[in-house]
From Swiss-Prot:
It comes from the Bacteria. Gene3D superfamilies: HUPs. This is Sulfate adenylyltransferase subunit 2. The lineage of its organism: Bacteria, Pseudomonadati, Pseudomonadota, Gammaproteobacteria, Enterobacterales. Belongs to the PAPS reductase family. CysD subfamily. Heterodimer composed of CysD, the smaller subunit, and CysN. It comes from Erwinia tasmaniensis (strain DSM 17950 / CFBP 7177 / CIP 109463 / NCPPB 4357 / Et1/99). Pfam families: PAPS_reduct.
Length: 302
């Protein structure tokens, strides 16, 4: 394929499809992480393109904390049913037994037990040797230096000083027993690329990405949308309706909304063209401490 004859988005698409096919051919038991967000939706769309008209040759995996937005769960179940994919859902049973939640135990412990440990449990349980993720290099500085094939040891830990070179489009997938890789087909995409591709391909997304009047309160410097009754209001807090949307999605107590009037995909793209802040500014887990994302990845986080 002559890359010079392709548009920017089609070049990114071709690269991602090549990576997905390469992993499917090279590894014995791959899986695709499905977190229900915009990047996961694009990655799933690319995977379906990669193997069309056949079905996906690997299952989807959702590591569920029990604290996602209700609209995310509804979207997940509908999407999986519509495309006929196999979905595996894993919740950390020890975390559930301990009643771990972001309000009582804080974002760091909640993320470590319900997401990081939950992910490692699921990968071990099913014996996956490769796991696709939707992370992009423009999101955060630790992800900017991570390879497309991110190697993990038998404890799922990432060592940024022990990464293999990736020359041109050649990827080294050799792993020893117990080791695995995390694969990031969207590494070279930007947030703007993602939205332009969603618009171009008419990819369905969770409605929370579009601006609408929603019940929110201000806490810890972010706008928290109240999604159910598991919250206790602090003195002086008031729930009010505001026109907001989300640039990134996660557990609802840990994900901040942004005030916006963008009710359509062109409106979101217009916002992205003038935005000077990271989409992860609304993720409470990234504020735990300096370099917290890299520390999480060293411990096994995606």
């Amino acid at each position: 394929m002559d890359q010079q004859r392709l548009t920017h988005l089609r070049q990114l698409e071709a690269e991602s499809i090549h990576i997905i096919r390469e992993v499917a051919a090279e590894f014995a038991n791959p899986v695709m992480m499905y977190s229900i967000g915009k990047d996961s939706s694009v990655m799933l769309h690319l995977a379906r393109k990669a193997f069309y008209p056949g079905t996906l040759p690997f299952p989807l995996l959702h590591v569920d904390t029990g604290w996602k937005f209700r609209e995310m769960y509804e979207f997940r179940d509908r999407m999986v049913k519509n495309i006929g994919a196999e979905l595996l859902v894993h919740r950390n049973p020890e975390g559930l037994a301990m009643g771990i939640n972001p309000f009582v135990h804080g974002s760091a412990k909640h993320t470590d037990i319900m997401k990081t440990e939950g992910l490692k449990q699921a990968l071990d349980k099913y014996g996956f040797d490769a796991a696709f993720g939707g992370a992009r290099r423009d999101e955060e500085k630790s992800r900017a230096k991570e390879r497309i094939y991110s190697f993990r040891d038998r404890f799922h830990r990432w060592d940024p000083k022990n990464q293999r070179p990736e020359l041109w489009h050649n990827y080294n997938g050799q792993v020893n027993k117990g080791e695995s890789i995390r694969v990031f087909p969207l590494s070279n995409w930007t947030e703007l690329d993602i939205w332009q591709y969603i618009f171009l391909e008419n990819i369905e997304i969770v409605p929370l990405y579009l601006a609408a009047p929603r019940p929110v309160l201000e806490r810890d410097g972010m706008l928290m949308m109240i999604d159910d009754d598991r919250i206790n209001l602090q003195p002086g807090e008031v729930i009010e309706q505001r026109m907001v949307r989300f640039r990134t999605l996660g557990c609802w107590p840990l994900t901040g909304a942004v005030e916006s009037e963008a009710q359509t995909l062109p409106g979101i793209i217009e916002e992205m063209l003038v935005s000077t802040t990271s989409e992860r500014q609304g993720r409470m887990i990234d504020r735990d401490q300096a370099g917290s994302m890299e520390l999480k990845k060293r411990q096994g986080y995606f």
